[in-house]
C-alpha cells in the first residue's frame, strides 16, 4: 500500500512538473477552446480603396472602409475575434504626408478594432523624430489605438553606449504609447500572449533607423520563456515584421518558428507574401495575406489536448468593390485625407483629386517589374518624366539631361486606364523625404562617366535577376544584354539616344549629365561596397569631383525641391489634349516599347564569348588557374601512385 501511495505521489508530481514545463495542458473533460483571428500586414497607408492591375485585369481593391465591413460581419458571428497586424502600416499613399502630425494609419487601425500591431521598417522612413512624433500624435488624439509590441529592441546596449538624441526620442515615445515586448489579451475563454519581432532584413531596409536590435530568435525565445513563467496563457502569437522567402534557409519567420517552437501562430509581414495555405513548422502556423489590404486574412483554430493549436479554417478574403464600404469609416478617412490638401499638397499647387491626364494606355503591373527582365512602359514614362521636368524647371541652366534612371524598387504602383489624379501619381512614387523635410524623394542632378553608364546597364543585366528591385529603366540610354553570357559581362551593346532618336556612342572618359531620385543616387553610390569593390559608380559634380552629400544636389524648382512624384505630375500635364476636353491625354507612344532594353537570347558560342570585358577576362583567368591547379594535383597523385607500384 505504501509503495502504491509513493507511486501515485511520484506520478502526480511528475504530471505537475510536465505541465509546468510545457506551459500548456488541457483537461480532457473540458470542451476544446476555439479562437477566430483576423490579420493584415504591409498596409502601407492604403486607407482608401485604389485602382490597380492584377493578372492583366484592372481592379478596384482594398480600403479600410471595406475592411471594416468584413470585420463587422465577422464580429457579428463571434465578438471574441482577435485582430492582428504585422507592421508597415505606413508609407505608400498621400496620407503618409501627415504621418508625423496626424498618425492617420495607426488611428485607423484602432478604428478597425485591431488589437495588436508591431513596427515595420517603413515606420522609420521619416527618421527617429518622425516615428516619435507619430506615436505621440496618436496618443494625443485620444482615440482607441492598437497595442504595440516589439521584443528585440536592445535598449540595454543603447543605454550602455549612451542614447543618441534620436534613440532618446523613440524611447520616450515608446513609454508614452506603452510599447511592450508582449501583451496579454483575453478573448472569451482564450487567453493569448502576443509578442512582436523586428526582422534582420527589415533592419537592412531601414537606413534611417537609429535603434539597435537583438537577434530576433534569441529575443523571442527569452520573451516566450518570460511569458511561460509569468502568464497563464492558452496561446502564444507573434506579429513579426521579418517575412518568408522561397528559400527556407533564409526565410526569417520559418527560422523563427524552428528556433522558438512554443510560438503557436506567426502573422508574417515585410515580404508582402500571400500564402494560399499556412506554412506549418512543427506546431507553429505561419500566415500572410499580401500587401495594401487587398485581402483580409482569416484563420480559425482549436486547441488540442496537448495544449497546442490546429487550424480549422484558413482563408484570404479578397477586398473587392463588391463589398460595401462602411460609411462611418469612409467619412473618418475623408476627414483625415482633407488634411493632406491643406498641410502638404498646397506646397506644390495641387489637390488630391485633381486630374492630371486621361489615359487609354495599358501600363504594366508592379508584379511584371519583378517577373519580366525587359523594357516596360511604366519605367519609360517615369524616366521620361524626370528628363522633362529637370529640363523645364525654372532653375534649369539649359543643360540637357543625357540619362534618367528609375529602379523598379522605387515604383510603388502603376497607372490604370481612365483619369490619372495627383493622388495616383503620388502613390506611384511615394517613398522618402528630402532635405526640406517634406515627404517625397527629390530628384538629384549628377554626372557619371561613360564607363560608369555602361556599368549601370550591367547592374541591371547581371544583378537584377537576383535582386529585382535593381531592375533599371532608362531614358536616353539603350542597351542590349545576353542573359546567357558570363555575369558582369552580359551587356553587348550600350549607347545614348537623343530626342531625335539618333544613336550616340558612349565615350568612356566623358562626363554625362544623369538625373535620378535621391534614393537611387544613394543606391548607385553604394554599389562599390555592395559588390566588394568589383564595380564602381561614383556620382560626381559637373567638374568631375565625387559628391559627398547627394542631398545638396537636389534639383530645385524655385525655392522648393523638385520631388520625383511632382516631376511625373508635371510631365502628365504637359501632354497634348488630343480630344480637346481641356485635359491632357497620355500619348500612344507609351503603348509600345522602343528598344531601350533588349534581351538577346542567342546561345551561339561566338556571341557568348565575344567582346569580353575585364570581369570576364578575370573570371576566365581564375578558371584557368583553378583547372591548372587541379591538373597539377592529379599529375602529382598519379606520380605518387606509380612510385608506390
For every predicted segment, state its role.
Residues 5-6, 18, 23, 37, ...:
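Generic detector of low-complexity/intrinsically disordered segments
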Residues 3-7, 24, 265, 398-404:
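Generic signature of intrinsically disordered, low-complexity, basic-rich segments
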Residues 1-6, 643-645:
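Positively charged n-region of N-terminal signal peptides that target proteins for export
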Residues 27-322, 447, 464:
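Acidic, metal/ion-coordinating pockets
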Residues 31-39, 46-60, 64-76, 111, ...:
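Catalytic centers of hydrolytic enzymes
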Residues 17-21, 194, 347, 396:
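Intrinsically disordered, low-complexity segments enriched in small/polar residues
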Residues 3-25, 625-633:
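Sec-dependent N-terminal signal peptides of Gram-positive bacterial secreted proteins and lipoproteins
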Residues 8-10, 29, 617:
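Intrinsic disorder/low-complexity segments
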